[in-house]
Regions:
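Solvent-exposed, non-transmembrane regions of integral membrane proteins
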Residues: 1-659
Length: 659
């Protein structure tokens, strides 16, 4: 009964989404408020029915309803309670439900926010949102039905992928999908602006905060994904340029470019065509990432199973891009800028260069990701493109972007004079050079690391200089330094939230540079009671013990770690053996530190526990990534908060940075 009810709810939601999209479009075309109201009720119905689907599937997981193929494939009677809930999005079909539900929720919020305030753009935006929802519901109905019946009904299920039994997988997909689906709102309003012909700043003003919200969640998803990779996969890294990692990173890059370039349109009425192109690319890349993840055409630790779903996504992506760029071509005459670039030494130029570098990074990531597929299609042989290619091409681009993070906020609009350049950048340049020189004096010989350290010092100095000047100006009104600084963050939160985001990126950059330059590792086979030494640590092998868990068996090693001062910690890495898996899963153990992490992986071992192979890593400055990511997300959250209404006439500094 449950499979049939779930399928009926899915079909009902699909019918409502199709009807709502048509009614909204017709209402916008004919100016019919009754059709618009009907489409709004349809949007609510879509959300209600998808919510019912989710609750029904959660109930099926909790009650071990193995008559549903998806439940039997992703849980068993030994799966812990909370992982039975998160198994909802642990594989292909459930992840599509989560996507569709989030999309319907965003649609509902959009209805409540704009149905009375945006009579021209809103109906068409609603039609686009419901049309996209209809596609995902179609996927749930035909190629990836979550309620497909399984017969005969097994006594127990296969179980969840062991790598997903982690707290990171509770939050990582949710944050990532909130980011992906969030970009649908600015895309929908951009399409509405093209359809109606209102190609000015209106759609950007409407969607600015929506874009920051989506960017915030996508950033959070990438951060949690890096943490999951670091502490679950057992290789000691946080970013492998895996195709699915790249698929989430590409829309982040184009969305970051969009968030910066819209400021030029707001300030100078330039880049209208460019901004529309960027939001189309960002939304299209979210679909492309979904296609990569779910089509099975690539090999990835994140990818789902193969099936006809890839064809559905590829066709839909093609239709979206064809329709969007056709609208763009139709309105081309209306998209000519009202201003021109006055000088290469200007804020507009800095932001434009920022955009070009971000798009160049997105293109290189895209090319490296799809090249194996192109090679296989043309030559019949798949060529592997790994981290060396991505690092070689992207490191210079990212260094240039760090430099522009320091230039953009302080250089003048239109044309910067020599005096403006001297006043704003002389001291930061001196600090940047001094920072690089200090690192060299401390023994840093890697040129890339030296450049990164110097650029980070330069950008940090520009941020501090801007804060100091603005706080000093506020002090003239009688505020203290603390009140002045706090007031800046609260009253101009979009600007200073962006600065905090930049500060977080600087800390992340330091973490990446430090971890790549100074980390070290060793691998050794040692007898019980023996030790291995690395970078001042002594790791002694004490014991191996078998442990029986509810859904797996594991062997836990005990290792006592000492440093130069004496006993430091005890680490207990393990090997997990799942009945449904061919190979064991490594469960790493680690001790996190501000400057370095001690990371231990248990390899092969003797059955009698007489000896074991271990990999020991000293990963330096990796914690800076998580600290920088936290700072970044806090800055983005600050930029999302609406600025308070001003009751005084105090001059407001111009916006320069956005998250």
């Amino acid at each position: 009964m449950t499979p049939e009810l779930g399928y009926a709810l899915t079909v009902g939601a699909l019918v409502l989404a199709l009807y709502g999209a048509g009614a909204a479009a017709l209402g916008g075309l004919k100016g019919r408020p009754d059709l618009q109201a009907s489409s709004e009720r349809a949007a609510f119905g879509v959300w209600l029915l998808i919510s019912a689907c989710m609750l029904l599937l959660v109930y099926a997981f909790l009650s071990f309803d193995f008559s549903i193929r998806y439940v039997a494939s992703n849980t068993n009677r030994g799966t812990p309670f909370y992982y039975r809930i998160t198994a909802l999005w642990g594989a292909l079909e459930g992840s599509i439900i989560l996507w569709a539900w989030m999309l319907s929720l965003y649609t509902l919020i959009m209805v409540g926010r704009y149905r009375r305030t945006q009579p021209q753009l809103y109906p068409w935006a609603l039609a686009v949102m419901l049309g996209i929802s209809a596609f995902f519901l179609l996927v749930m109905t035909i190629p990836a039905p979550p309620f497909e019946r399984l017969s005969p009904i097994p006594a127990d299920g296969r179980g969840l992928n062991p790598l997903l039994e982690d707290s990171g997988m509770i939050t990582h997909p949710v944050a990532l999908y909130l980011g992906f689906t969030g970009f649908t709102v600015p895309f929908a309003f951009a399409m509405a602006a093209l359809i109606v012909g209102r190609t000015g700043d209106e759609w950007i003003t409407i969607t600015r905060r929506w874009t920051i919200v989506a960017w915030y969640f996508l950033s959070l998803g990438l951060l949690i994904g890096g943490w999951w990779s670091y502490h679950v996969l057992g290789w000691g890294g946080y970013w492998a340029w895996d195709p699915v990692e790249n698929a989430a990173f590409m829309p982040w890059l184009t969305a970051t470019a969009f968030l910066h370039s819209v400021m030029i349109q707001e300030r100078r009425r330039m880049l209208k065509l460019w901004n529309l192109t960027l939001i189309i690319l960002t939304f299209s890349l979210t679909l492309f990432g979904t296609f990569l993840t779910r089509s099975g055409i690539i090999g990835s630790v994140h990818a789902f199973t193969q099936g006809s779903i890839g064809i559905f996504f590829l066709v839909f992506l093609s239709l979206v891009m064809l329709g969007a760029f056709s609208l763009l071509a139709w309105r081309l005459e209306r998209l000519r800028g009202q201003s021109e670039l006055d000088s290469i030494f200007s804020r507009e130029s800095a932001f434009l260069l920022n955009n070009l570098f971000l798009i160049a990074a997105a293109f290189t990531v895209f090319f490296g990701t799809v090249f194996p597929l192109l090679s296989e299609a043309v030559k019949g042989q798949k060529v592997s493109v790994g981290a060396p290619f991505f690092n070689l091409v992207n490191i210079p681009i990212f260094l240039a972007l760090i430099f522009l993070m320091g230039v953009g906020p302080l250089i003048a609009w239109r044309r910067a004079s020599a005096e403006n350049l001297r006043r704003n950048f002389l001291m930061p340049v001196v600090i940047g050079v001094a920072g690089a020189a200090l690192c060299r004096a401390l023994g840093v010989g890697n040129l890339i690391v030296l450049c990164c350290m110097g650029l980070v010092a330069f950008v940090a100095a520009t941020i501090a200089l801007d804060f100091w000047r603005a706080a000093r100006a506020r002090r003239r009104t009688g505020d203290g330094w603390l009140d002045a600084t706090w007031g800046l963050a609260l009253r101009q939160n979009r600007r200073y939230g962006g600065f905090i985001v930049h500060l977080g990126i600087l800390v992340v950059a330091l973490g990446v540079a430090g971890s790549q330059a100074w980390s070290t590792q060793t691998e050794a086979t040692i007898n019980r009671g023996a030790s291995v030494e690395l970078a001042g640590y002594t790791i002694r092998f004490d014991d191996l013990q078998p442990v029986e868990e509810s859904n797996h068996f594991k062997v836990v090693g005990t290792f006592t770690v000492s440093d130069r001062r004496g006993p430091y910690t005890v680490l207990t890495p393990a090997k997990k053996f799942y009945p449904q898996e061919q190979t064991p899963i490594a469960a790493v153990d680690y001790r996190l530190g501000f400057m370095e992490d001690l990371y231990l992986v248990l390899g092969d071992f003797a059955r009698d526990g007489s000896h074991a192979t271990i990999k020991v890593q000293i990963n330096r400055m990796v914690s800076w990534l998580w600290i920088g990511g936290l700072i970044l997300t806090l800055g983005a959250a600050l930029a999302i908060v609406p600025e308070p209404r001003r009751t005084a006439t105090r001059p407001r500094p111009e916006h320069a940075v956005v998250a």
